[in-house]
């Protein structure tokens, strides 16, 4: 296929640049048509930047990947979808907001666009989605991270070691908006934000972000585990997240939100 895939990005940080690097190495030609940032003059990196969603959409992207946080997804996603452009959100946790999710689905349906949910830092998302058709009774996500991966992104004290949080996926994405977007993907693939249980643990000896997914139901049960190295010390995201965003942008390996 010789026609370049035109990709727009919301954000221009570490995750966005890592994903763009993966896209640049694909056999299919890919053109990054621009990044949407608050202040194009302060943007770092070599990617072209725009200061408004109108300017980004004027570049005629085939797909837009959001890499800028839950607030950015809430601000720009509806306009992107209403323009008939597919959206790949990194900040899937924002979709715990039922009103926002409903508005985005309505905009996508009206314009013939899709919301492509990436697998993120976890394996087994496709299996969980398949198991849902048979019957899923319980889903648990357990994340174990070094203190630096959590402490700078939340307000309030956290323990030095051990259990930092236990609750629903809906509660988790509110408590850790930059760290547990993966739980949003798991909730959407499985049994929802209120029934999906989340445990967050801190381990000062950890050298990677460890993600575990446990599910049980009429299909049987499974336990998936990923030990993901972070993109950099300045980013809470695992390296595989950038790969999953690139894969979803290219048109495979994603959950179509409906």
Swiss-Prot record:
Task: Show the catalytic activity.
Answer: L-aspartate + NADP(+) + H2O = oxaloacetate + NH4(+) + NADPH + H(+); L-aspartate + NAD(+) + H2O = oxaloacetate + NH4(+) + NADH + H(+)
InterPro entries in the record, alphabetically?
Asp/hSer_DH_NAD-bd, Asp_DH, Asp_DH_prok, L-Asp_DH, NAD(P)-bd_dom_sf
Q: Which Gene3D superfamilies match?
A: Dihydrodipicolinate Reductase, domain 2 (3.30.360.10), NAD(P)-binding Rossmann-like Domain (3.40.50.720)
Q: Where are the transmembrane segments?
A: none
Binding of NAD(+) occurs at: 121, 181
Task: Return any one Pfam family short name.
Answer: Asp_DH_C
**What keywords appear on the UniProt entry?**
NAD, NADP, Oxidoreductase, Pyridine nucleotide biosynthesis
Residues the record marks as active site: 211
**The protein's enzyme class:** oxidoreductase
Q: Which GO terms describe its biological process?
A: NAD biosynthetic process
What metabolic or biological pathway is this protein involved in? Answer: Cofactor biosynthesis; NAD(+) biosynthesis; iminoaspartate from L-aspartate (dehydrogenase route): step 1/1
The signal sequence is none
Keyword presence, NAD: yes
GO MF term set? aspartate dehydrogenase activity; NAD binding; NADP binding; oxidoreductase activity, acting on the CH-NH2 group of donors, NAD or NADP as acceptor
What is the role of the protein in this entry? Specifically catalyzes the NAD or NADP-dependent dehydrogenation of L-aspartate to iminoaspartate.
Q: What does the similarity note say?
A: Belongs to the L-aspartate dehydrogenase family.
Other comments on record? The iminoaspartate product is unstable in aqueous solution and can decompose to oxaloacetate and ammonia.
The protein's name: L-aspartate dehydrogenase 1
Naturally occurring in which organism (per UniProt):
Bordetella pertussis (strain Tohama I / ATCC BAA-589 / NCTC 13251)
> Could you read off the lineage of the organism from its UniProt record?
Bacteria, Pseudomonadati, Pseudomonadota, Betaproteobacteria, Burkholderiales
Q: Which gene encodes it?
A: nadX1
């Amino acid at each position: 296929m010789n026609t370049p895939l035109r990709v727009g990005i919301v954000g221009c940080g570490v995750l966005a640049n890592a994903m763009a690097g993966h896209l640049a190495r694909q056999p299919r030609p890919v053109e990054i048509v621009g990044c949407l940032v608050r202040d194009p003059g302060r943007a770092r990196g070599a990617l072209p930047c725009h200061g408004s969603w109108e300017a980004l959409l004027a570049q005629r992207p085939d797909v837009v990947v959001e890499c800028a946080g839950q607030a950015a997804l809430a601000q720009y996603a509806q306009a992107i979808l209403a323009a008939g452009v597919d959206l790949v959100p990194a900040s899937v946790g924002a979709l715990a907001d039922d009103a926002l999710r409903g508005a985005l689905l309505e905009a996508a349906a009206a314009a013939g666009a899709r919301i492509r949910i990436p697998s993120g830092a976890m394996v087994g998302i496709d299996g969980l989605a398949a198991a849902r058709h048979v019957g899923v009774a319980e889903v648990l996500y357990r994340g174990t991270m070094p203190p630096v991966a959590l402490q700078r992104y939340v307000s309030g004290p956290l323990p030095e070691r051990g259990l930092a949080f236990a609750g629903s996926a809906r509660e988790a994405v509110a408590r850790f908006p930059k760290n547990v977007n993966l739980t949003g993907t798991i909730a959407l693939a499985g049994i929802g934000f209120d029934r999906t249980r989340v445990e967050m643990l801190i381990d000062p000896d950890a050298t990677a972000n460890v993600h575990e997914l446990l599910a049980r139901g009429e299909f049987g049960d499974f336990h998936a585990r990923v030990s993901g190295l972070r993109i950099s010390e300045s980013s809470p995201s695992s390296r595989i997240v950038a790969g999953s965003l690139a894969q979803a942008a290219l048109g495979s390996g994603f959950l179509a939100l409906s």
